[in-house]
């Protein structure tokens, strides 16, 4: 888990193509052990993303089924997660200047809360039609 230790202190902003193989390897190595369901054979890439986010909260984003679908990253495989990282990097870069006072909430966590409110719970309607 040397690779994960190197990602833990990092922020999403410098995410680059050099990071892609590491993220794919971590994603795939976490997915199999986090299987669930009745027979323990159902892969949960939601659980994978949650675990990775807990271990590198400013670098590896959270997702769930509605969020992944909303960002066009379904069926939620490792390469989709990398594409999602790129999307979150771009959004984090746009959002960061709007957050003048640093606090204990990472930009990725703020983006997750936004996406959860809009796409998972549908508490917020964007009206972008």
Listing of model-derived features with the role each one plays in the protein:
Residues 22, 26, 43, 47, ...:
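Residue-level detector of well-ordered alpha-helical segments, enriched
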Residues 33-54, 67:
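Helix-hairpin-helix
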Residues 63-129:
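C-terminal accessory module of base-excision DNA glycosylases/AP lyases that mediates lesion recognition
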Residues 1-43:
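Helix-hairpin-helix/helix-loop-helix acidic hairpins
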Residues 54-61:
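Catalytic Zn2+-binding segment of zinc metalloproteases
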Residues 5, 52-53, 101-106:
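Homeobox/homeodomain signature
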Residues 1-5, 30, 59, 81, ...:
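Generic hydrophobic, helix-prone segments enriched in Leu/Val/Ile
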């Amino acid at each position: 888990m040397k690779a994960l230790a190197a990602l833990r202190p990092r922020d999403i902003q410098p995410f680059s193509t050099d990071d892609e193989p590491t993220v794919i390897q971590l994603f795939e190595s976490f997915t199999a052990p986090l299987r669930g369901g009745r027979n323990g054979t159902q892969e949960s890439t939601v659980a994978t993303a949650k675990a990775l986010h807990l271990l590198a909260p400013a670098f590896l984003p959270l997702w769930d089924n509605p969020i992944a679908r909303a960002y066009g990253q379904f069926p939620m495989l490792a390469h989709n997660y990398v594409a999602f990282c790129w999307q979150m990097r771009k959004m984090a870069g746009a959002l960061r200047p709007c957050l003048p006072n640093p606090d204990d909430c990472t930009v990725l966590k703020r983006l997750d809360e936004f996406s959860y409110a809009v796409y998972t719970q549908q508490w917020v309607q964007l009206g972008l039609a």
